[in-house]
From Swiss-Prot:
Listed PANTHER family: L-AMINO ACID N-ACETYLTRANSFERASE
GO molecular function: diamine N-acetyltransferase activity
Function: Involved in the protection against polyamine toxicity by regulating their concentration. Could also be involved in the negative control of sporulation as well as production of degradative enzymes such as alpha-amylase, levansucrase and alkaline phosphatase. Catalyzes the transfer of an acetyl group from acetyl coenzyme A (AcCoA) to an acceptor substrate and release both CoA and the acetylated product. It can use a variety of substrates including spermidine, L-tryptophan, L-leucine, L-lysine, dopamine and tyramine.
Top EC category: transferase
Domain of life: Archaea
Ranges for domain N-acetyltransferase: 3-160
Annotated site, May have an important role in the acetylation of the polyamine, chain positions: G142
GO BP terms, alphabetized: negative regulation of sporulation
Recorded family membership: Belongs to the acetyltransferase family.
Organism encoding this protein: Thermoplasma acidophilum (strain ATCC 25905 / DSM 1728 / JCM 9062 / NBRC 15155 / AMRC-C165)
Binding residues annotated for acetyl-CoA, in chain numbering: L92, Y93, L94, T99, H100, K101, K102, I103, G104, N131, S136, K140
Active site (catalytic residues): Y138
Protein's UniProt name: Spermidine N(1)-acetyltransferase
Length: 161
């Protein structure tokens, strides 16, 4: 299986929402109710919201939105918001059957290459305390817990200039 990483396009919108739904249900089962997950998906992954973020990413503005594709099918994505020399990792999700296959790491490394070219010195993210898979992934990839915010760990990774 070959994996292609590229910026998401408008044509990826429907599949992006489905990947998000599958991933959220798998990641947060036992943490949040199914009703809460569906409500979150409707609010945070609405077509209008994602379309705006895809367009901003294509225009190289303040959003970097990359997809991982297996045989031309979207299987995961990463989204970062960039402000000056800092980035916030907003989302990194994979279809459940593609976890633990180094695809998340490939997405993160590709995003980090782009961040370095943009002069990003630090990346921050929030991960739910009970999301042990996510926490372990970020920790193994160089992120350290810097603080907490409610039910989330705030993790950061510093980069050389």
């Amino acid at each position: 299986m070959s994996i292609e990483i590229r910026k998401l396009s408008i044509e990826d919108l429907e599949t992006l929402i489905e990947v998000a739904r599958e991933s959220w249900k798998w990641t947060y089962a036992g943490i949040y109710s199914e009703e809460y997950i569906e409500s979150w998906i409707r609010e945070k992954y609405s077509k209008e919201k994602l379309l705006n973020e895809i367009v901003r990413s294509q225009s190289n503005l303040d959003i970097l939105f990359l997809g991982a594709f297996a045989d031309s099918t979207l299987i995961g994505f990463i989204e970062l918001k960039i402000i000056a020399n800092k980035a916030e990792l907003l989302r990194l999700y994979l279809k459940p059957e593609y976890t633990h296959k180094k695809i998340g790491k490939t997405l993160l490394l590709e995003a980090e290459k782009i961040m370095k070219k943009k002069g990003i010195l630090e990346c921050r993210l929030y991960v739910h305390r009970q999301n042990s898979v996510g926490f372990s992934f970020y920790y193994k990839n160089g992120f350290k817990v810097e603080d907490t915010d409610g039910s989330d760990f705030i993790m950061e990774k510093k980069y050389e200039s």
